[in-house]
UniProtKB/Swiss-Prot annotation:
<keyword id="KW-0662">Pyridine nucleotide biosynthesis</keyword>
<dbReference type="GO" id="GO:0005737">
    <property type="term" value="C:cytoplasm"/>
</dbReference>
<protein>
    <recommendedName>
        <fullName>Nicotinamide-nucleotide adenylyltransferase</fullName>
        <ecNumber>2.7.7.1</ecNumber>
    </recommendedName>
</protein>
<keyword id="KW-0547">Nucleotide-binding</keyword>
<keyword id="KW-0963">Cytoplasm</keyword>
<dbReference type="InterPro" id="IPR014729">
    <property type="entry name" value="Rossmann-like_a/b/a_fold"/>
</dbReference>
<keyword id="KW-0548">Nucleotidyltransferase</keyword>
<dbReference type="InterPro" id="IPR004821">
    <property type="entry name" value="Cyt_trans-like"/>
</dbReference>
<dbReference type="GO" id="GO:0005524">
    <property type="term" value="F:ATP binding"/>
</dbReference>
<keyword id="KW-0067">ATP-binding</keyword>
<dbReference type="InterPro" id="IPR006418">
    <property type="entry name" value="NMN_Atrans_arc"/>
</dbReference>
<dbReference type="GO" id="GO:0000309">
    <property type="term" value="F:nicotinamide-nucleotide adenylyltransferase activity"/>
</dbReference>
<dbReference type="GO" id="GO:0009435">
    <property type="term" value="P:NAD biosynthetic process"/>
</dbReference>
<comment type="similarity">
    <text>Belongs to the archaeal NMN adenylyltransferase family.</text>
</comment>
<keyword id="KW-0520">NAD</keyword>
<comment type="pathway">
    <text>Cofactor biosynthesis; NAD(+) biosynthesis; NAD(+) from nicotinamide D-ribonucleotide: step 1/1.</text>
</comment>
<keyword id="KW-0808">Transferase</keyword>
Length: 171
C-alpha cells in the first residue's frame, strides 16, 4: 500500500520524523508531499522546496523507509487540487493529514483519510522552532542533525533574521 502525507516542513523536525516512522510501519511506501512548494523567503515559509527536499532526504537516508518526496504547488482552486496532486504523484490509496481542508478534499474523492497522531506538539512545532531561530534560542535539539547541517549550509538562521528586519527605520 502507498500513502500520501503532505506538509510544509518549515523546517522538517523530529515530530515530522516520528510521524513518518510510524506511517512507514503501516504502509509499503510514503509519498511525502512538500506542500506550498512555490513559497519561500518569508517568515512563515523561509525555506525553498529544494532546501526542504534536502532536509527530508538527508534525514531519511538513515532509516529503512521507502518514500518519494514530491513538491506540491498551492493552486488556490480547491475543487481541483486533488487532481493536481494526483497528476504529480504515483498512485496512492490512503492520505495522512491533520489539515481539515485536505481531509475534506480527499474524502470527497473517496480516499481513505487518516489523521496522524502528532508527536509532542508542545515542543515540535515549525512555528515555535522558527521563532527560536529568530530570537537566538536553542532550536537544534528539535530537528534531526541533518536538518541542522542543511540550515547551516544555506545560512538559514541569518535569512530568517534578515526577513524579519524592517525595510525602513520608524521615526
Amino acid at each position: 500500500m502507498r500513502a500520501f502525507l503532505i506538509g510544509r516542513w518549515q523546517p522538517f523536525h523530529k515530530g515530522h520524523l516520528e510521524i513518518i516512522k510510524k506511517i512507514s510501519k503501516e504502509v509499503d511506501e510514503i509519498i511525502i508531499g512538500i506542500g506550498s512548494c512555490q513559497k519561500s523567503h518569508t517568515l512563515t515559509d523561509p525555506f525553498t522546496a529544494g532546501e526542504r527536499m534536502m532536509m527530508i532526504t538527508k534525514t531519511l537516508e538513515n532509516y529503512d523507509i521507502n518514500y518519494y518526496a514530491i513538491p506540491i504547488n498551492d493552486i488556490d482552486y480547491n475543487a481541483v487540487w486533488v487532481s493536481s496532486v494526483e497528476s504529480l504523484t504515483p498512485p496512492f490509496t490512503t492520505v495522512y493529514t491533520g489539515n481539515s481542508l485536505v481531509r475534506e478534499l480527499f474524502s470527497e474523492k473517496n480516499y481513505a483519510v487518516k489523521k496522524p497522531e502528532l508527536y509532542n506538539r508542545t515542543d515540535y512545532s515549525g512555528t515555535k522552532i522558527r521563532k527560536k531561530m529568530l530570537d537566538g534560542s536553542t532550536w537544534e535539539h528539535l530537528v534531526p542533525e541533518e536538518v541542522v547541517k542543511v540550515i547551516e549550509e544555506i545560512d538559514g538562521i541569518n535569512r530568517i533574521r534578515r526577513l524579519n528586519e524592517k525595510d525602513y527605520d520608524e521615526e
